Amino acid sequence: MSEVRVKVKLTFPESEVRRAVLATLVRQFDVEPNIRRADVEEHRGWIVCEIDGEATQVEAALEWLRGERITVDLLGDVLES
């Protein structure tokens, strides 16, 4: 199993701003998000974070986010450790 780190920008629509999506990533996908920057307001929000974990789990977490109407933009390369 290979561990990876991806840097992403997550953009939340108004309907998803109040959800604890990073907590869900930890519990459901066994990945570790590390918030680098964020701007969350009542009607919109974004988070730049690194997500560490096993490659298949990180990809599953990103797909889940996309399915929840959260825009996922990859920032830079995927780093393997």
Briefly describe each language-model feature range.
Residues 1-81:
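Long, contiguous binding/interaction regions
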